[in-house]
Regions:
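Glycine-rich phosphate-binding loops at beta-strand->alpha-helix junctions
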Residues: 200-227, 238-242
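Short glycine-rich phosphate-binding loop at a beta-alpha junction
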Residues: 54-66, 202-214, 232-235
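Short beta-strand-loop/turn "lid" adjacent to the catalytic site in phosphate-handling enzymes
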Residues: 20, 28-32, 50-82, 110, ...
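Gly/Thr-rich phosphate-binding beta-strand-loop-beta motif of the actin/hexokinase/Hsp70
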Residues: 1-21, 95-112
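Glycine-rich phosphate-binding loop plus the immediately following alpha-helix
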Residues: 35-36, 113-159, 163
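Adenine-nucleotide phosphate-binding core of ATP-dependent small-molecule kinases
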Residues: 167-201, 239
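Short glycine-rich, Thr/Ser-proximal phosphate-binding strand/loop in the N-terminal lobe
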Residues: 3-45, 117-119, 123-124
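Glycine-rich phosphate-binding/hydrolytic loop that grips phosphoryl groups
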Residues: 133, 235-254
Length: 254
């Protein structure tokens, strides 16, 4: 059985295919855009172009994520926590703490013996999410990668507000005072990482695994490891953890 996982997030829509041998055979990521339904259709078209027919007799599809109910061709809908846990087990192992920083929320999942033992989620405030970094990078007139590169050479400038709106006002004030851009970039990233580390530190502890879009930001990984006092492991496929977990579960459907 071929399993296809569709993970419609708030900012990125991802698909993953697990083949009959249980290997991750294909992945794809696209911006979610305005419509989750349109995003799921674009992923279906990408799958078809890659040779995967979602209506095939030997294919099963599981949808997850923020827009999981907007995938009309899914055979089953499964929660984000379950799919991220399953995906993390496939990528990293069956024990540890998974930290997933998404566009609009941050999830911390404790794995024990290959199962989700407990989890915590911050979906009420964007200040500890990828969206916060996106907003601040826009305010600084640079990309998120440029912000990370600048932050390496910056001195820490404290961004104290717990609210994205007020934090943006702080950044505007710092810009107005002539604070070097690299210092502001360092302060912004440290602000996000400290919030994430606080959540993760309340879980079971090491080993730590980072998934989600920020796993591709090496500076974020370094700063998170420094604050946790423990290595943080990631993977080239870590941003697809939810989709991979959904695909694994799809492959197990009868």
């Amino acid at each position: 059985m071929i399993g296809i996982g569709i993970d419609i997030g708030s900012t990125a829509a991802k698909a993953a295919v697990v083949d009959g041998e249980g290997s991750v055979a294909w992945t794809c990521v696209q911006p979610t855009g305005f419509s989750s339904v349109d995003a799921s259709e674009r992923l279906r078209e990408a799958l078809a172009a890659a040779g995967y027919d979602v209506t095939g007799d030997d294919v099963r599809v599981v949808a997850t994520g923020y827009g999981r109910v907007a995938v009309p061709y899914a055979h089953k809908v499964v929660t984000e926590i379950t799919c991220h846990g399953t995906g993390a087990v496939r990528l990293f192992g069956d024990h540890g703490t998974v930290i997933d920083v998404g566009g609009q929320d941050t999830k911390v999942i404790q794995l024990k013996s290959g199962r989700v033992a407990k989890f915590a989620m911050n979906d009420k405030c964007a200040a500890g999410t990828g969206r916060f970094l996106e907003i601040m990078a826009d305010r600084l007139g640079i990309s998120q990668q440029q912000m990370a590169d600048l932050a390496r050479s910056g001195e820490p400038t404290k961004i104290s507000s717990m609210c994205t709106v007020f934090a943006e006002s702080e950044v505007i004030s710092l810009i107005g005072r002539g604070e070097p851009r690299e210092n502001i970039a360092r302060g912004v990233i440290d602000s996000v990482v400290s919030r994430v580390a606080t959540m993760a530190g309340q879980a079971a502890g090491a080993p730590y695994y980072l998934t989600g879009g920020l796993c591709e930001n090496a500076y974020v990984v370094e700063r998170l490891a420094a604050l946790l006092g423990s290595p943080v492991t990631t993977s080239p496929q870590a941003r697809f953890a939810g989709a991979i977990g959904a695909a694994v579960r799809a492959a197990a459907l009868a």
